Each structure stands twice: as structure tokens, then as C-alpha cells.
Amino acid sequence: MEVSAVLRGVHLSPQKARLVADLVRGKKVDQALNILAFTPKKGAEVIKKVVESAIANAEHNEGADIDELKVTSIYVDKGLVLKRIRARAKGRAGRIIKPTCHITVTVGN
């Protein structure tokens, strides 16, 4: 039994989110939540929210026992890239790139 949760359009670089995702891949869910609670990165609280959602889905939809669940897979895909312009000196313009990502977490036995 595997249950997943997806969070799309997170205002976070996929590269930065993958650093945090690698910390919890393959861990038991209680251990993963503990790691995420004490990781001082923005991506940690976002991924913690998705892991909690996947746990709630498993408990509600499948009636799974939380103590036996582990993070079977977690991956971060590149999302939409917002491009903005910042005015610079002498009539020039600088490009601002605001990356987003999609986070998918799968929990199972």
C-alpha cells in the first residue's frame, strides 16, 4: 500500500528543495518529521507539510498504521519559472528569475 501527496507551485528553487528531500528519503515517518522539524531551511517546513499530508491520506483513505509507515519516495520536479524585470542604470534592465517546484511524497510500508 502506497499513498502519495503532491504540493505544486512552491515558491522555492528545486535545487534547494532537493537538498532537504534527500535527508528524509527512505526514513520512517516519525524520524522524517523529527529531522524536518530541526532542519533550519525554508524547504524543510514545506516538505514537512507534504509528509504530514501524505500520512493523513494514508490514515484516512487506507486506514494505515502510522508507526509502520516510511517515506518510500520523495522527489522534487521543476515548476513554472516566473520572469520579472528590474530597472537598472542607463536605461538597461536586469532579469529576475523566480523558480517554483512541485514536491511529491509517497509513504508506504
From Swiss-Prot:
GO terms for biological process: translation. Part of the 50S ribosomal subunit. Belongs to the universal ribosomal protein uL22 family. It holds the Pfam family Ribosomal_L22. The keyword Ribonucleoprotein applies. One of its GO terms (cellular component) is cytosolic large ribosomal subunit. SUPFAM superfamilies: Ribosomal protein L22. CDD domains: Ribosomal_L22. Keywords: Ribonucleoprotein, Ribosomal protein, RNA-binding, rRNA-binding. This protein binds specifically to 23S rRNA; its binding is stimulated by other ribosomal proteins, e.g. L4, L17, and L20. It is important during the early stages of 50S assembly. It makes multiple contacts with different domains of the 23S rRNA in the assembled 50S subunit and ribosome. The globular domain of the protein is located near the polypeptide exit tunnel on the outside of the subunit, while an extended beta-hairpin is found that lines the wall of the exit tunnel in the center of the 70S ribosome. PROSITE patterns: RIBOSOMAL_L22. The lineage of its organism: Bacteria, Pseudomonadati, Pseudomonadota, Betaproteobacteria, Nitrosomonadales. InterPro entries: Ribosomal_uL22, Ribosomal_uL22_bac/chlpt-type, Ribosomal_uL22_bac/org-type, Ribosomal_uL22_CS, Ribosomal_uL22_sf. This is Large ribosomal subunit protein uL22. The keyword Glycoprotein does not apply.
